[in-house]
Amino acid sequence: MPFLDIQKRFGLNIDRWLTTQSAEQPYKMASRCHAFEKEWIECAHGIGYTRAEKECKIEYDDFIECLLRQKTMRRTGTIRKQRDKLIKEGKYTPPPHHIGKGEPRP
């Protein structure tokens, strides 16, 4: 925290929107994970770091999953492997537009 907050004194909001997604955004468009971050901040506000780690773990985990999409990517990879396996066995034929043989678009 700076000793003299010039942005606040002059009413400027130059980079504050970068630090917290829940902050007011320049074009009034909420970020992808705004709701999850807001829930986590509301849960953790005022109870301290140690208690917040325990009591707000669900909200924090939801927020981190929204940011990093690790579970989603893992699931997508599993689905893709299963699809490739079925194609190799001959049990599944992808549609022509998925393999690049569809009609060209205008």
Curated annotation (Swiss-Prot):
Region Disordered, residue ranges: 78-106
Short motif (Cx9C motif 2): ranges: 56-66
Main location group: mitochondrion
InterPro entries hit by this protein: NADH_UbQ_OxRdtase_FeS-su5 (IPR019342)
Keywords: Disulfide bond, Electron transport, Membrane, Mitochondrion, Mitochondrion inner membrane, Respiratory chain, Transport
Domain of life, source organism: Eukaryota
Pfam families for this protein: Ndufs5
PROSITE patterns documented for this protein: CHCH (PS51808)
Chain location of the short sequence motif Cx9C motif 1 per the record: 33-43
Mode of membrane association: Peripheral membrane protein
Disulfide bonds: 33-66, 43-56
Gene Ontology biological-process annotations: mitochondrial respiratory chain complex I assembly
UniProt subunit comment: Mammalian complex I is composed of 45 different subunits. This is a component of the iron-sulfur (IP) fragment of the enzyme.
Described purpose of this protein according to its UniProt entry: Accessory subunit of the mitochondrial membrane respiratory chain NADH dehydrogenase (Complex I), that is believed not to be involved in catalysis. Complex I functions in the transfer of electrons from NADH to the respiratory chain. The immediate electron acceptor for the enzyme is believed to be ubiquinone.
Family: Belongs to the complex I NDUFS5 subunit family.
Protein's name in the database: NADH dehydrogenase [ubiquinone] iron-sulfur protein 5
Species of origin: Pongo abelii (Sumatran orangutan)
